[in-house]
Amino acid sequence: RKAPRVHVPVWQSFALSEVELTDSYFKKAMDLHKGYLLSLDVDRLIPHVRRSVGLQGKGDNYGGWEKHGGCTYGHYMSACAMMYASTGEKALLDKLNYMLDELQECQKQTPDGWFITGKRGKEGYLQLLQGNVVLNQPDETGQPWNYNQNGNSWYCIHKILAGLRDAYVYAGCRQAKDILMPLADFISHIALNLSLIHISEPTRQEAI
């Protein structure tokens, strides 16, 4: 009789805090990244979010891609959470918690917790749910990736939901999960009730 086979995992995950870089090119690069994250002003990353729910912005948006208000703050939450998990730098956690406080204040101004895309963006999703898709409305550069006046919204939503998830998973911020769940409830209801064509057409526009 053969002995029972014992499953030995080929690999297993480990926490970011279990890896410590010594003085090297990678450590210098990591320190540069950490310094950059600490240099950014949270109030300049999300003034458009505050304005979209009727609150006054506390700063001016950064220039370039952020000039008209973008979703970089989602990536910023991910970066701060992971860098905090790697380094234990409390200043990163402080920035992350401040951003979460601000986003939760925005969320409280809405009837259903949806604050990401503002009123116009929300209406665009509801139009999708009704089967209405207006494609190829170019943005200010002429790029035809706009639909239902929503820009590249699935892309932005992913950044923000992932940022909140990472704040919870990597930095242990319970508040991030509290903000995330109403957002996930709203957008999952939309996504689960869309036809394949109404999923594929907008996402194809975003891939152009």
Tell what function each PLM region has.
Residues 1-72, 91, 97-138, 174:
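Low-complexity, Ser/Thr/Pro/Gly-enriched N-terminal "stalk/linker" regions
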Residues 18-19, 24-28, 76-90, 158-174, ...:
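Well-ordered alpha-helical scaffold segments within catalytic/enzyme domains
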Residues 21, 44, 48, 71, ...:
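Generic alpha-helical secondary structure signal
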Residues 66-70, 86, 150, 154, ...:
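Alpha-solenoid helical-repeat scaffolds
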Residues 83, 96, 103, 167, ...:
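Alpha-helical solenoid scaffolds that mediate protein-protein interactions
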Residues 86-98, 152-155:
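Aromatic- and glycine-enriched glycan-recognition loops and surfaces
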Residues 129-151, 183-196:
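Asp-box/WD-like beta-propeller blade repeats and closely related beta-sheet repeat scaffolds
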Residues 197-208:
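Single conserved hydrophobic/aromatic residue that forms the stacking wall/gate
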